[in-house]
Each structure stands twice: as structure tokens, then as C-alpha cells.
Amino acid sequence: MSAEIIREIDVQSVMTKSSLPVGGYSVNPYVGCPHACRYCYASFMKRFTGHTEAWGTFLDVKRWKPITNPHKYDGQRIVIGSVTDGYNPFEEFYGRTRLLLEQLRGTNAEIMICTKSDLVLRDLDLLKQFPKVTVSWSVNTLDENFRADMDHAVSIERRLAAMKQVYEAGIRTVCFVSPIFPGITDVPAIIERVKTFTDLIWLENLNLRGQFKTDIMTYIREKYPQKYPLYEAIYNRKEMSYWQNLELEIAAYAAQNQYPYRINDLPYGRAKQSKPVLVNYFYHEKIRLNNPR
């Protein structure tokens, strides 16, 4: 746990209309995230909340008016954890995400949870009560040393163990291979590791912008100097050939192994055992919602 400044704040509503490509509502029971991921795009939230502290060192715990009519969200998609992790370590004490799920019981909305934690296992009893629920874990490496350099979340093995348990409980799971670090993330290795207990594998490339670009580029230069020219080409000279070639390689790999493959799609449903659907999100702005598989 890396958050040093924790405060409780009152908000009118925890439900926010989403501008994300996945649509629906974006719900974040916390402001900030103690995982302190070095590449996290959500660090931009600082400028809207008055925080000047380093990302990962603060956490606002939201208190909201109770959701009394969960049917208001019927037919919607509710994404929990778009700019925080609802199952960050402090959730074990504050229980805001569990409270949210309790208040949403009865809705037929599609619940989508994004996490890097295994604390979600605590709420399996609640998750089973929703007709449509998906839990996704971010996994962009099988190398625990690289993982530890990038975030303060639980180990990859704990994430995968949780994914397997949720899958076996009958809940749809996603392995979110994000962000893909050029020359470092081994996409096929991750797919082969998780294929028996996940329905979808989302693939998203590393985007470097804002303050964390300098940090990541410095890290690559110091820890992976042989990769630095590649990062220079992609992120300073805006060359796209690496991603274009990787896209072709993934498509060929999917065809060879008979994995369904989609581009910028958000299919719903369970996959065949050991045949997860691979979804390429290299171009988020063109995502098509709910297209049939």
C-alpha cells in the first residue's frame, strides 16, 4: 500500500455518465490509486481534484447518497474502476466497492470490473447475483521483476489465481494485456498462460503522454538500453511499423491457434473452453459496442 494521504469525501453521486468507448456509466468509489502504476493514464485526474501529490500517494474515499433505484441503470453498462482500482488494498477496510455492488443489486445492467487485485474474490457472493458481470485483470508481463518496477499491485500469480477462481465460479473473465510494452511484453506467452480460464483477451498498446512519458523513457534507457532505440522510434519519431507488424503477428497467431480474433469490438458472452476471443484495442476510438461474435 503506497497511499500516504487518505481522506473521506462526500459526493452527490458515484455514478458518472461515461465518455469511455465502452459507454454506459463509469463508477469510481475512490479518487487516486495506491497501485501507483508508472504508465497510468488516470494520473490526469489530479488536475480535477486539487491534488498536487505524486500519483499513488493519495486516496480519496467517496461517500455518496445511497442508490435507491438500481433499475434506473437497466440495460446499461457500468464500468467499475476506470480511473482507480475499486479493489485497491484500502477497500478491505473501507468496503466502498462492496457497498456499491450491494446498492446495485436488482439491476440487469452489465457490470464490468477492472482490477489488478485478488480482493475481488471477497465479493463473489454478490457478483453471482448479477445476470451480466465481467471481471478483468490487467496483466502485461509474466516477469515479476518488471511487474514490480511498474506497479505496487499484487503479484501476477495472485491475479491469475483469482482469474481462475472467478472463471470457475461461472463469471466471465478478461485478461487485459495492457499496456503492451514494445519488445518486452510477450503476448503469446500470456495468452497460453491464461487461455484455460479466461473468455476474452484484450490487447492494448502502450501510449506515452504527459508526465509519465519521461519516466518510462528514462526507465527503458536505464533498464533495457538495447530496447531504447525502438522506443525512440515509436514515441519520439511516431513510427507505427512496430504496431502494424505486431498486429499482423497476433492475427496470424490467432488464426494458427484457432482463437477468434476481433478488432475494436466489445463482444459479450462466454468463449469456448481454451479458445478465448482475442480483441485488438490498438485503436480505441473506433471500438464497436456489442457487435456479435
Each language-model region and where it sits:
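Conserved Radical SAM active-site core
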Residues: M1-T134, L142-F146, I156-E157, E168
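Surface-exposed cleft-lining segments at the edges of enzyme active sites
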Residues: G86-N88, E144-H152, R172-S178, R237
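Auxiliary Fe-S-binding modules of radical SAM enzymes
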Residues: S2-D10, P188-R293
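Surface-exposed amphipathic alpha-helices with a cationic face
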Residues: R105, K128, L160-G170, A251-N257
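Conserved strand-turn element in the central/C-terminal portion of the radical SAM core barrel
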Residues: K164-T185, N236-M240
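Generic structural signal for well-ordered alpha-helices
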Residues: W64-K65, R98-L101, L124, R159-M163, ...
